[in-house]
Amino acid sequence: MDAFASFFHSINKKSQQKYYALIPDILNILPPLKETSNSDDLTKALLAMVDLAEAAPKMFRPLFHDLVTFSITVIQDKELDDQARQNALELMATFADQNPQMCRKDPSYTSEMVTQCLSLMTDVGIDDDDAEEWNASEDVSRDPLYFAS
């Protein structure tokens, strides 16, 4: 995938359109990487997809909804490394930046993006410095200091 992204960037815009037909085959690489929980390779593949989406987001138009659906499943999969999940979110954000019209037309893009962003914001990982302390703390909203007399 990296090789295709590098090659794609090296050719002129007019020639790039000839390679749009390869996108379905390229996207077919992603599901097996996710199914085998191969986070490192999935992370690299998603970064290559981000590069391609920055260069020519319109080439993804025919399969955009499928790509959104796949990316959402990656973001939701807590068995994958955080980096892979974040790269899937970055891919979706790249489309919003590069081709907002395409995102607007997709029936699930906006609601799923908002939901997944909020979900990722609430994830507390094992390696978070304050996670253990935060989980053990009392609810401050019940503390009398926070109530007005």
Descriptions of predicted regions:
Residues 1-149:
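Karyopherin-beta/Importin-beta family HEAT-repeat alpha-solenoid scaffold
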